[in-house]
């Protein structure tokens, strides 16, 4: 799979670098985005990714967040943030108004994942999605013992989890194909959140989470 991410005119792609100011999965996301890109970060929380991309890589970023406290924190850090419901209000963004849309550890918490992905593919030719993997071996073991899965990637108990659409990597990749996406790159993480590499037969068993670089139909890199 190709890791190239075309951006706006004059944008430069970077080699992977260390991002000490970002959590591990967001550092991987940042390395997939070319300098100078127009970036929309859905579920941006305190705006950490947008702030990093703007200050260090010349990107133009906008965050979307529904938590009012997180919105205030992001604005206080100098990030452009819009308070919107990802499930219901993405139609407010124009077609191809961004180069890339990021949805980091949020898809499983949306009410209508298919509609959210459809809106993302309308807004930008490339999407980056990160998700926890419900198929991790320790999750399966907990289920066999009659307990709901928990891990560093899924730290919530059954009664307070925001996750309502849990999926394994196999489930997710089938779903992405059905939605018309091409997976250009997949980065795997182990149960502790470190970047890892396994052959396909083991990825769904050993991965705690994954980041996907997606191209909408007709926009995949040859």
Language-model-derived ranges and their functions:
Residues 19-36:
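Conserved alpha-helix/loop element of class I SAM-dependent methyltransferases that forms part
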Residues 114-119, 126-220:
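S-adenosyl-L-methionine-dependent methyltransferase catalytic module, highlighting the catalytic core
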Residues 47-51:
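Glycine-rich SAM-binding Motif I of class I
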Residues 89-95:
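Short conserved loop adjoining the S-adenosyl-L-methionine
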Residues 7-22:
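Class I SAM-dependent methyltransferase Rossmann-like catalytic core
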Residues 43-45:
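Class I SAM-dependent methyltransferase "Motif I" SAM/SAH-binding loop
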Residues 100-111:
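A short SAM/SAH-binding and catalytic strip from SAM-dependent methyltransferases
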Residues 52-89:
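Class I SAM-dependent methyltransferase SAM/SAH-binding core
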